[in-house]
From Swiss-Prot:
Subcellular location: Cytoplasm
Listed name of the protein: Imidazoleglycerol-phosphate dehydratase
Catalytic activity of the protein: D-erythro-1-(imidazol-4-yl)glycerol 3-phosphate = 3-(imidazol-4-yl)-2-oxopropyl phosphate + H2O
Pathway: Amino-acid biosynthesis; L-histidine biosynthesis; L-histidine from 5-phospho-alpha-D-ribose 1-diphosphate: step 6/9
GO molecular function: imidazoleglycerol-phosphate dehydratase activity
PROSITE patterns xrefs: IGP_DEHYDRATASE_1 (PS00954), IGP_DEHYDRATASE_2 (PS00955)
GO cellular component term of the entry, any: cytoplasm
Major subcellular site: cytoplasm
Length: 192
């Protein structure tokens, strides 16, 4: 199933769709480094993502990065509500040469982000690295996930961020994996 949403504000105009059919993705955020990271997200999560975004990137990349995270989170929440029967938990360690990242995801209905990653530099190209945390906070809060992101070993800043995105994507993909178990994956009987 394809989940689609538009978001139009004074700062950004977004048209985003997500599906779990692994169809080809098209990503145009206007921010080259973010395009690269979201391409990795689609490959490693097994999700298809189509993004057409325009924003005030002449100011900086903050609004478009955060707003894309908000919409991806909202679409993931819709997908989760429709799935009902899924693994729920996902954990992944990803090395990227000298760096090592760990991400743990719980599709809990309780939004929480622990972001324990001191990135080596403030920029990768023109991209402000503090936006990595802003992006994940937007996704996690809007998808209602509990997520722990830890950069265990650092080095090259591009590698650090890439390892984090890959680990999150793989952990999310595991957590979203469908199961034959007809019970809601919570002893409460509900995930809200």
């Amino acid at each position: 199933m394809i989940y689609q949403k538009q978001r139009n504000t004074a700062e950004t105009q977004l048209n985003i769709s997500i599906s779990d059919d692994q169809s080809p993705s098209h990503i145009n955020t206007g921010v080259g480094f973010l395009n690269h990271m979201l391409t990795l997200f689609t490959f490693h999560s097994g999700l298809s993502l189509n993004i057409e975004a325009q924003g005030d990137i002449d100011v900086d990349d903050h609004h478009v990065t955060e707003d894309i995270g908000i919409v991806i989170g909202q679409l993931l929440l819709e997908m989760i509500k429709d799935k009902k029967h899924f693994v729920r938990y996902g954990t992944m360690y990803i090395p990227m040469d000298e760096t090592l990242a760990r991400v743990v995801v719980d599709i809990s209905g309780r939004p929480y982000l622990s972001f324990n990653a001191t990135l080596s530099k403030e920029k990768v190209g023109t991209f402000d690295t503090e936006l990595v945390e802003e992006f994940f906070r937007a996704v996690v809060i809007n998808a209602r996930l509990t997520t722990h992101i830890d950069l265990i070993r650092g080095g090259n800043t591009h590698h650090e961020i890439e390892a984090i995105f890959k680990a999150f994507s793989r952990a999310l993909g595991i957590a979203l994996t469908a199961t034959d178990d007809q019970r809601v994956p919570s002893s409460k009987g509900v995930i809200e």
